[in-house]
Amino acid sequence: MHETRHLSARNVTLSFGGLQALNGVSFDVHPGEILAIIGPNGAGKTSLLNCINGFYRPDSGSIVFEGYEVTRTPAHKIASLGIARTFQSTALYTGLSTLDNLLAARHIHMRANMLQCLLYWGAAHREDIVHRQVVEEIIDFLEIEHIRKAVVGALPHGLRKRVELGRALALQPRLLLLDEPMTGMNQEEKEDMARFILDVHEKRGTTLVLIEHDMGLVMDIAQRMVVLDFGMKIAEGIPDEIRHNEAVIKAYLGEAV
């Protein structure tokens, strides 16, 4: 960990017509940390993730990942650089199985040409073996062996969220962006997801940026926090500092923590 910055955002500004979604947001993500981005609904949290992974292009500012300027890089290229993403609402292939959803995510690592893939020759066959090994390891890691052949659209919400996490892990990211991974879950499901998130961080060595509204869980698992309000950063620090920050209490936390 000789680098002090895994990702660096500087003065990121984004607007939609007359709506200012982000206003000069700057922060760093350090290698190997869990960083939480919190704030009220409409604060700009998801818009910020969309800028990082190439879904949105900021009006101004810069985003640098591992020395590469990615501010205006297309989303598929950013994924190939090592940034993966989950969403508030699961974005899975609901007609496919858990296994096939995870295999579909491996496309950015495919090197065989189209003819080889169609005929399943040589490099395509060897690649398929590797991709399946990666996916099967993730299925074991997330404890979803019992649903590996199940059609995703028929799964309960909590398991679909776990499959989506698995699909992101199938990209083998060095930076993983999690947009409300526990939304819609009951307490037991939230605790399971928190455990998997910590395992991704500790056992797979993945750097994480997390958006989540359950402040109890966020305070427990995040190492640092960035707080947004009306598209502006109003605070940054370790959880205990954020917990007692007057501006954050007024804008978002209240007496909840």
Task: Say what each PLM segment does.
Residues 2-257:
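Glycine-rich phosphate-binding loops of nucleotide-dependent enzymes
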